[in-house]
Structures are given as C-alpha cells and as structure tokens.
C-alpha cells in the first residue's frame, strides 16, 4: 500500500543509507508479474511511457523505446501513483543529485520525517500564499507526469513520431526527474529557499529560533554551492559556525552540533579538472537556452558532484 511504502522509505532514511531511491514498477516481457495470472490477481492497470528521448528513424523506419508502468492495482490507485511519482523526483534530486544535501540532512538531524517533508513540498497547502513560480513548478511537474503516460503503444508511437517529424528531432525532455531536477538547480532559485524555509516552519510549528537560524545559514550555503555554469566564479564569502565538510565525511552519522567549531568565514572553490570540464561544456552548448542548458548539464556533467563548489574554510 501507499502508507506501507512511506513507512519503508522513512525507515530507510532513518537507517542512514547514503542513497535512497524510489522507482515505479514497470513490467517487462518474461517477468513473472507480467503473466495474466498475476495481472488478474492483483488487478494491475498499466500504461506506457517513452524511455527518455530514445526515439528516432533508422533507414526510414521510426523506432522508440518504452516502459510499461504499473499505475494502479488492488492496493493503490492512480492518485497514489502520482504521489509516488512526485516523491520519486525529490528522492532523485536529493540523493542522486545532491540538491541542498546539507539542508535535507539537517531536517533528519532535528527529527523531521523527510518523506513527509517531500510530500508537503509537492502538495502545497492551498490555504497558504505561495510564490507563483513554486506553484507553477509543481503544476508543471504533475501535468508532465500525467502526460508522459499513454493508454496504448499505438498512441505512444504515433505521438512520438509526430513530434519527431515536426521537429526533425526529439521533443521536450521526457526524462522528468532530470529535467525538473535541473529546474530546481538553475531556474527556480528565486523562490526555493523561501519555500523550503516555510515548509520547515509548517511541518514543525514548535521549531525554536536557534534551529531556524541554523536552517537559514544552511539554505544560504546550499544555494551558493550550486555552480552558475555560465559564470562559474563565485566570490561570495559566507560565515558559519559548523564544519560541514567534517559532517559530510562522517556520513552524517553524528549530529551537526558535534561539528560546531566557532564562527568562520567560508568561500567556494573548484578543482582545475572541474573548471576544465565546465569550460568545455559551455563551449559546446553555449547556443542553448537556459532551461535546455541546465538539463543537458545535469545529464552530461558527471559525477554530479562536479556541479557544486567545494567549501574552503579560512
């Protein structure tokens, strides 16, 4: 069920795993669950989606790769599927993409359930006034999560073929995790800190002023850790009382307050190899608009740790 899955995810986070990933079940030819016996037993309903942008013409014949995705069964409905899909995005962004990693580790450190926070982030309370850009981001993702699904293979192939022939190329990215992760990294920075802070307060209305002050410091650092790929030099100097690199090296197994070592200035640097990788990427992709530029960056600059500065303590 959806609730049992949430409990398993929370338990995995609490156990301190370095990576926690969430994937929707898809069925393949030959697997046991794809037999009629099990489809009927569990009342499975499936739909189809393109596998990335893997469609093209070869010798005049249009071909496309796809997944057959489970969207309903006797234990959960389509709305549960969409909620899982939204959680999938945030688990990918944080655990594989290192998005605001210190902030989300801090939430765990102060006892806030991470999965509940993710659920709230992707389902903003309509009674609260939120930034327009944030609401648009959530709306865009949920619409894209619906629109990536097709009732039949014929419908999927027809749509992909029409897009390919119209553009003489693939269309908008259908790898939703990467695309919306790239938006959080580069296109949505004007509201991200404000929204994360507000959700922190709403999820824990008894949070004390000191914890909120630390959260503000961490949010500021996390925002500045993301390299502006078009202008990669960050000359900002911030202050903090914590050794975040030491906390990271401990794999976050100790509480953050164990790494309090007095107020110090920090700046942000890149390794030579990292600078060269980014320079080369920019030369090859300078013609792209900002959103495509960000998407291609998170898709091709690997490891993704190279998308972030390193903290240097003065």
Regions found by a protein language model. Give the residues of each.
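A structural motif corresponding to the C-terminal lobe/cap of the Radical SAM core domain
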Residues: 1-121, 226, 232, 237-247, ...
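Charge-dense, extended regions
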Residues: 157-314
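Generic detection of long, well-ordered alpha-helical segments
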Residues: 2, 74-81, 131, 182, ...
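C-terminal non-catalytic alpha-helical accessory regions
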Residues: 79-190
